[in-house]
Regions:
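Non-catalytic interaction/Regulatory regions outside core domains
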Residues: 1-130
Length: 130
């Protein structure tokens, strides 16, 4: 991890922590050249080796490269994409793309988005029936 090069997202932890409380899992800023783990909860950190963290950051960087394409397809109707949301069994990740290879990832425990996830659960249940 390169801590000498500033990556975006330093203030996000202080902004999000009061409302997220113990459900905040991580805040990571990344650029094409470096990344900074601004916050990672101890139990989450225990599950990640340095190699796994680097692999996850690389995946986030790759995801930024599709931003222009997504905006060109959906932008005229929906406006530009502001944030990508990935829902996992135990976590919700928000990825805010700032430019190619640059962004901020904020992860929460899945329970953090319980109200919003109800719609997703209903859709998943319907698709399982199909």
């Amino acid at each position: 991890m390169d801590t000498n090069t500033p990556a975006p997202g330093k203030r996000i932890h202080t902004v999000v922590q009061p409302t997220a409380r113990s459900q905040l899992r991580s805040v990571v800023g990344y650029t094409p050249e470096s990344y900074t783990v601004h916050y990672i909860r101890d139990d989450v950190k225990a599950q990640y080796s340095d190699e796994k963290i680097q692999s996850a950051i690389e995946e986030l960087r790759l995801g930024t490269l599709e931003q222009d394409h997504i905006d060109s397809v959906f932008g005229a109707v929906h406006g530009n994409q502001q944030c990508r949301i990935d829902v996992f069994e135990r976590a919700i990740e928000l990825n805010f793309v700032l430019s190619d290879g640059t962004g901020v990832e904020v992860a929460f425990d899945r329970e953090w988005g319980t109200d919003q996830l109800e719609v997703i659960k209903q859709i998943q249940a319907t698709l399982e029936e199909w």
